[in-house]
Regions:
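A solvent-exposed interaction/effector surface
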Residues: 1-138
Length: 138
């Protein structure tokens, strides 16, 4: 749906270049039988940011305005398993910093908040890939 939007399936029939990063906000499951929720964000090019073309299928949204993030960079293709491994490593690196219990991915007031994964490369690039996992702080 989002790829079709940037390829011209929008009210203005405007094709846009793909931008980076592709950001995936991940809302962890709160109960054992639930699935995590993934929300994928494509950034629109700067010339469309004030007035992005509308679409019945893809809805422009503003991202949450978190103040800070702890970030861990990693290579390769991004998937559920390496996101999980990298997120665990990022959480481990925060132990004892005062941020280890305040990140948005830690349970807060009975609910889990989001963390994000970002991919910076085209799916056709196979070498020197750059990805990040992010824990958000307010």
């Amino acid at each position: 749906m989002l790829f079709a939007y940037i390829r011209g399936n929008n009210d203005a029939a405007v094709k846009m270049n793909m931008t980076a990063p592709v950001l995936v906000n991940i809302h962890p499951r709160t109960e054992h039988l639930q699935n995590s929720t993934y929300v994928v964000h494509f950034y629109v090019p700067q010339k469309f940011q004030r007035n992005p073309p509308l679409s019945a299928e893809a809805q422009p949204v503003e991202l949450p305005q978190h103040k800070y993030a702890a970030v861990r960079r990693f290579g390769g293709f991004m998937d559920d398993s390496n996101i999980s491994v990298q997120l665990s490593a990022l959480k481990k690196s925060l132990k004892g910093t005062g941020r280890d219990k305040s990140s948005a991915s830690i349970q807060h007031s009975g609910r889990f908040l989001l963390y994000s994964a970002a991919g910076y490369n085209s799916p056709f690039e196979h070498e020197n890939r750059v990805n990040e996992v992010m824990l958000w702080f307010d």
